[in-house]
Amino acid sequence: KDIPWKIYPNHPDLSVEQEVAEYNACATNAFGEWRFEDVCLDFQPDIVVDIRDFWMMEFEQRSPFRRMFHWAIMPTVDAYPQNEQWLETFCKADSVFAYYEFGKSVLEKETGGQINTVGVASPSAASCYKQVANKTQHRNSMGIDPDSVIIGTVMRNQRRKLYPDLFKSFRQILEKTQKTNLFLYCHTSYPDIGWDIPRLLTENGI
């Protein structure tokens, strides 16, 4: 479709062997490292905004064009202490946003106030993110039993995520309650670099 802005695809052309080899040469190329300098040269951005984890964005700080753009980041900070290398990189950003007050306070405390935190991102005001007025009607419209109980999780399929424990625990809940209206909803990606989800589901009889 026609869009009013430039788009720079990151995935290699699978018909070009050299391009595929270059892409596969470094794991962080999946996050755009191999394209970043070319995009900077072509687009010449004044501001680069990145809302991802440290390892998905740190190459931007090492760019030879770093002094040419304002670097605004919003890293995931959900625990402490933070890795010192991460903190050093975050401190080099021109402006840093946090997801919530906890992350902001961790960054400020662990960097001794050397980081330029500019605020906490507000939750979306879009109507689609508001709680539905009638859950029964909403579930019926989606073809879901209104009496069902849905347990949900949102996380990438990575080895550090405890998917095996999650599925094992859900199986235990099913056996303990003997309820047939319990559902586990995983908002995730597959395949990814993590667990073999179909195998885990089969092993746990889910």
Functional labels for PLM-detected ranges:
Residues Q131-I150, L174-K179:
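Nucleotide-sugar donor-binding and catalytic loop/hinge architecture
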Residues R66-H70, A93-D94, G113-N116, T180-L182:
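A short helix->loop->beta-strand "cap" motif at the edges of active sites that frequently abuts
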Residues D145-K161, F167, L184-C186:
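Conserved donor-binding/catalytic core segment of Leloir-type glycosyltransferases
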Residues F170-L174, L201:
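A conserved amphipathic alpha-helix that caps or lines the catalytic cleft of carbohydrate-
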Residues M74, Y99, A121, T153-N157, ...:
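Short hydrophobic "strand-cap" motifs at the C-terminus of beta-strands
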Residues P64-R66, G194-I206:
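Nucleotide-activated donor-binding/catalytic signature segment of Leloir-type glycosyltransferases, i.e.
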Residues I3-K92, E101-F102:
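Extended catalytic core of nucleotide-activated donor transferases of GT-like folds
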Residues K92-N134:
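Donor nucleotide-sugar binding/catalytic pocket of nucleotide-sugar-dependent glycosyltransferases
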